[in-house]
Structures are given as C-alpha cells and as structure tokens.
C-alpha cells in the first residue's frame, strides 16, 4: 500500500518546549508547560493520561489544528509556527491524518465517498480516488460495505471507515484521540487491530491518546503528561 517517504534521520513530528494556557474564568490554567516529544517514522506511541490533563490539546497542537502560546512544532524537521495558514492547511492535508472518538463521517455519503473526499479535496482524479478508497476499505475488511452510508454500518465499521479516511492521502503521521472510546471491548479490540495492521503496512507514524492500558501496551512507546510535560512510561 502506497505511503509517502521522507528523511528518517529527523523525527516526523517534534514538539519543542510547547506551552499552552487557557483561561478558567479569569484565572490562567496551564495545560502544557515546556512539553517535548519526538515521533519517528513508523513508530506507534500511546499517550496515556487522565481526562483534563491536556491529551487532546497536545494532539491538536502536534497536528497543526491549534497554535501553542510558545514553542515550536517541527514537521519533517521544518518549523511550522511562521507558516501562512494556507501552507499549514496544505501540510495537514498531505502529511497528517486524524481519527477521533466520534467517527465524524458525513451521513449523506457512502463509506466509499467518505474515504474519497479528502483525496478529491487534495486534487486527485476521481478514478484515482475511487481506486485508493476501495483498496483501503478492502484492507480493513469493508470491501462489501463500500456503498453503505454511516447509519447502515455498525459502530466498529463506522470507525474503520474513519480510519480509512484518515489515511486516504497517505499521511506520514496519524493522530488518534480515543479512537475506540465509544466501542465495546470486543469491537474496540478488532478496530485497534485493524488500525495497527494499517500502521505497520504503511509505515505511518501514530500518536494515539487512550485510557486503555491494554491497548497502549501493544504500541512501541508509552508516554504520559505530568505537570504539563511529556514523560516516558515503562
């Protein structure tokens, strides 16, 4: 399965001294305080931390969806803080994929059309988008469900379509925020297995926020957040 290639002597994503505060009423609340994290090509990393610790904020900043108050996000070794919005958007479309706890599929579109959409936005021909969408959905065991709309799919199938959509543009890194959080344990296990198989097949890097220590234990590294900083777990 096609996957973008790049230099492997620098991290795909590197967070350097990331700081982020929010206002709680009129009181500033520090979420991230000098956080550092390197994510290497083909590496899967679990971010395990309590609710409210800043997991989603870290993922959003790493994925260029949110700007830090200070610090720098490097993508493929290049700083991104001074990029124009249009270039940041283009970088998200080409190098970064997202999977959320809620699948966020477009209800009026079929599974195939949902996976085609990011490719069409990027400018790929329809025939190429159809071919790649079918390939990914087939790899995830959904080859016979491509014409079904989200409401006609089970929860696990919906999330697998969301995963297929996230990797449709062959990103270099995938961010997943509690991707199995809404699923029962059996379905969550199947979805997670499919996700890990796809990650290994494409050598995409992945940072996944999860409460599930058993699933986190299957990944290459485990990190947490403590006092606004990233710490490695055994």
UniProtKB/Swiss-Prot annotation:
Record-annotated ABC transporter domain positions: 13-233
EC number of this enzyme: 7.6.2.-
Alphabetic keyword roster: ATP-binding, Cell inner membrane, Cell membrane, Membrane, Nucleotide-binding, Translocase, Transport
A GO biological-process term: protein localization to outer membrane
InterPro entries xrefs: AAA+_ATPase, ABC_transporter-like_ATP-bd, ABC_transporter-like_CS, ABC_transpr_LolD-like, MacB-like_ATP-bd, P-loop_NTPase
Location of this chain's protein in the cell: Cell inner membrane
GO CC term (a single one): plasma membrane
GO MF annotations in UniProt: ATP binding; ATP hydrolysis activity; transmembrane transporter activity
Function statement: Part of the ABC transporter complex LolCDE involved in the translocation of mature outer membrane-directed lipoproteins, from the inner membrane to the periplasmic chaperone, LolA. Responsible for the formation of the LolA-lipoprotein complex in an ATP-dependent manner.
Membrane-topology descriptor: Peripheral membrane protein
Entry binding sites for ATP: 49-56
Highest taxon above the source species: Bacteria
Membership in a protein family: Belongs to the ABC transporter superfamily. Lipoprotein translocase (TC 3.A.1.125) family.
Subunit annotation: The complex is composed of two ATP-binding proteins (LolD) and two transmembrane proteins (LolC and LolE).
Protein name: Lipoprotein-releasing system ATP-binding protein LolD
């Amino acid at each position: 399965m096609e996957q973008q290639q790049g230099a492997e002597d620098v991290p795909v994503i590197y967070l350097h001294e990331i700081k982020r505060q929010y206002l709680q009423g009129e009181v500033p609340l520090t979420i991230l305080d000098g956080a550092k994290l390197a994510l290497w090509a083909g590496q899967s990393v679990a971010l395990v931390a309590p609710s409210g610790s800043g997991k989603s904020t870290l993922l959003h900043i790493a994925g260029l969806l949110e700007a830090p108050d200070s610090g720098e996000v490097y993508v493929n070794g290049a700083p991104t803080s001074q990029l124009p919005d249009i270039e940041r958007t283009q970088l998200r479309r080409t190098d970064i994929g997202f999977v959320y706890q809620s699948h966020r599929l477009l209800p009026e579109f079929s599974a195939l059309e949902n996976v085609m959409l990011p490719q069409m936005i990027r400018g790929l021909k329809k025939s190429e988008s159809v071919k790649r969408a079918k390939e990914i959905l087939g790899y995830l065991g959904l080859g016979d469900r491509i014409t079904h709309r989200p409401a006609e799919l089970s929860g696990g199938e919906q999330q697998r379509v969301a995963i297929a959509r996230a990797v449709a543009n062959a990103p270099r890194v995938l961010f997943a925020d509690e991707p199995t959080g809404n699923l029962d344990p059996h379905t969550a296990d199947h979805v997670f297995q499919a996700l890990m198989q796809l990650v290994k097949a494409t050598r995409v890097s992945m940072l996944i926020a999860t409460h599930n220590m058993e699933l986190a234990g299957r990944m290459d590294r485990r990190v947490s957040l403590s006092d606004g900083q990233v710490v490695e777990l055994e």
